[in-house]
Amino acid sequence: MRLIFIAKMLQYSFLPFSPFNLLNFDNSISVSWFITYSVIVSIWGFAVWIEGAYRNKINLQLPRCTKIKCSRYNTRIKSPKWFNCKNWMHFFLLYLFLTASNLIVQLAYFSKEMCSQGINVPGTKKPGNRVYLSVIILMGNG
């Protein structure tokens, strides 16, 4: 079942999502819809990933009465605030990476579709030599 969730998440992340073709309001690209979609897919992917990590943690957890202490355990004992901050920082950076990569993929497919229909998308060059990253940069600064 988990494999099906991961396959669907990858399908929705790295393949064009057809409802975005209908989201042109007044011939302008609505970036908020792309961001919302990317956030939802990233949350979904993170939930599947966390569930697997939690299951592995429980299976690999040492019994409580053991005398063995690893470096991670020692770090958590010495500075618990830094340990929590570091974990949340990893979580946040990975989440931002997932959201940004999803956003780039969806915008690239969307701008390619718009160019094939003859609609001019800012940041694209000749039809054979399109630069999709510049579309995202222009939209972010716009």
Curated annotation (Swiss-Prot):
<dbReference type="GO" id="GO:0016020">
    <property type="term" value="C:membrane"/>
</dbReference>
<feature type="transmembrane region" description="Helical">
    <location>
        <begin position="3"/>
        <end position="23"/>
    </location>
</feature>
<protein>
    <recommendedName>
        <fullName>Uncharacterized protein YIL029C</fullName>
    </recommendedName>
</protein>
<keyword id="KW-0812">Transmembrane</keyword>
<feature type="transmembrane region" description="Helical">
    <location>
        <begin position="30"/>
        <end position="50"/>
    </location>
</feature>
<dbReference type="Pfam" id="PF15701">
    <property type="entry name" value="DUF4668"/>
</dbReference>
<dbReference type="InterPro" id="IPR031427">
    <property type="entry name" value="DUF4668"/>
</dbReference>
<keyword id="KW-1133">Transmembrane helix</keyword>
<keyword id="KW-0472">Membrane</keyword>
<feature type="transmembrane region" description="Helical">
    <location>
        <begin position="91"/>
        <end position="111"/>
    </location>
</feature>
